[in-house]
Amino acid sequence: MSNTILEAKNINKFFNDPIRIQVLSNISFSINKGEFVSLTGKSGCGKSTLLYVLSTMDTDYEGALYIDQEEMPKKNESFLAKIRNEKIGFVFQFHYLLNEFNVLRNVMLPGLKLNKYSEEEVEYRAMEKLRILGIDHLALKQANHVSGGEKQRVAIARALINDPHIIMGDEPTGNLDKKNSDLVFDIFNRLSDEFKQTLLIVTHDPSFAERTHRIIKMEDGKII
């Protein structure tokens, strides 16, 4: 049985306004279970554009995308929304926590949306994720009362709540100082090593990328 979690086959993408420009060109690669992969390249090379395609948030592309060996349709948004909630965890540069809720509730929200477990089970799972990340003591604090580095760890716990097949990150350390960036890297590394969590992280930080299992480097919309 294959352990390929994510596969892109000949992905091409064009922007058409005001003129037709190719922004992704013949992108093909795969990521196996437990791999910690970084996606790097200069600003404007297509990293974030590719991540949006790989995450199923952008379906306007040519080629094929497979998640857990299943080809992703381009026209079925309700199916793709379920895939995003169930099989993909997202961590962005900005944490996007909801200040009106405490830390625990923020982590629970994607689990409640999935509607696979009871609220009590989702709460238990959320506390487990917070414990793994060493921030269970923050569970009842309001989201706007924790530090920037802590907020990003809360966002990682939230990304883990549904036990996703892959975590995708778009510059998750871009807003953090070196200490907190290293902390986030160590968390990702531990998730990969101990829990066989698959990760694909867009980063412009060379010191972050060089410590991952593999670097996919982009230039002018191509993998080089």
Question: Which residues are covered by each model-predicted region?
Answer:
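A short, proline-enriched helix->beta-strand linker immediately N-terminal to the Walker B motif
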Residues: 161-165
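The feature captures the beta-strand-to-loop junction immediately N-terminal to the Walker
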Residues: 40-42
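Catalytic Walker B motif of ABC-type/P-loop ATPase nucleotide-binding domains
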Residues: 167-170
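Helix-to-loop junction immediately C-terminal to a conserved catalytic motif
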Residues: 55
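Short coil-to-helix segment of the ABC ATPase nucleotide-binding domain corresponding to the Q-loop/switch region
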Residues: 101-110
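Conserved ABC transporter NBD signature motif
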Residues: 63-74
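Conserved ABC ATPase signature
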Residues: 142-150
